[in-house]
From Swiss-Prot:
It comes from Burkholderia ambifaria (strain ATCC BAA-244 / DSM 16087 / CCUG 44356 / LMG 19182 / AMMD). Specifically methylates position 2 of adenine 2503 in 23S rRNA and position 2 of adenine 37 in tRNAs. m2A2503 modification seems to play a crucial role in the proofreading step occurring at the peptidyl transferase center and thus would serve to optimize ribosomal fidelity. This is Dual-specificity RNA methyltransferase RlmN. [4Fe-4S] cluster binds at residues 115, 119, 122. S-adenosyl-L-methionine binds at residues 176-177, 208, 230-232, 307. CDD domains: Radical_SAM (cd01335). Its EC number is 2.1.1.192.
Amino acid sequence: MTSETSVNLLDFDAEGLVAYCGSLGEKPFRAKQLQRWIHQYNAGDFDGMTDLAKSLREKLKGRASIVMPEIASDHVSTDGTRKWLIDVGNGNAVETVFIPEETRGTLCVSSQAGCAVNCRFCSTGKQGFSRNLSTAEIIGQLRMAEFALRASLGRAPGPNGKAERVVTNVVMMGMGEPLLNYNAVVPAMRLMLDDNAYGLSRRRVTLSTSGVVPMMDRLGAELPVALAVSLHAPNDALRDELVPLNKKHPLRELMAACQRYLKVAPRDFITFEYCMLDGVNDTEAHARELLAVTRDVPCKFNLIPFNPFPESGLIRSKPEQIKRFAQVLIDAGVVTTVRKTRGDDIDAACGQLAGAVKDRTRLAERTGAAAKIIEVRAI
């Protein structure tokens, strides 16, 4: 039985767990054993950790715990997308979304309850900011999803044979701005990359930021993973309106930070995300302006059809306009994709990550028609 003041071991990356074991008078290799039990074998208590000395297990039972986030709901979309609503206490909830594809499984992870950036097109921002998530609450989303998915597929973990993982990619693109919760996000990502935990490569962990320039530089120095930048506008005047953070870190400063990041990044390009808003940022002239502002940054574009919500006052760009916009970028030789909408029926699509969902109206009813979303790729 653990005490009310016990340490949650999910809050520790490898270095932190070594230090904690050291405080108990244990050698560093015990931390690796413990980490494998927690993150690879899904151990929920210490008694079953049979290769740990009994004396250590007794110490841990009195001083430590493995506390997972509480699942409030679990929904599966008709397209296979799975969304968990996670209760993080005091009326706050965050969401975790798994997107299955033929060759990979991507988990979208939240970093904050709410968001302070308040992008005009994002329903999460309309909730306002509640608090940062802890490292345990962030890595707990991956642990929860990985083992829930393994269980549904009959892939039981265990020390006698590590099961093939289901989550192959993680994107820090859920609720919140990850770089505004840097001190909790980075240890969680270290665990994602650690071979004694989840063993993902840096190319398979992507952090998405709205452009917190000083923290982009710090991330590049300390833990460069794949980077996506929420751009959404080709000039400062429009981006000031859509992404208020731009007033603090305008496009010239942001593009320079992207160039610096690429010197250490695991990929040789930045992904620029661009939410397609009808009559706001979606003309061919906007596309040409976008090419000009990003010309010195090796990049690819991910165009995101807007997911309407009542408070936004915005409309999704028409499919034919998205195609024309994309073609301008492709003709300039830039790899461009149009994100396929996934999980609309369970409000799991990009921009719909709001714990307190006020409007459960079907997306097709909001947009007037269920538009067929195209995907365009450079050849």
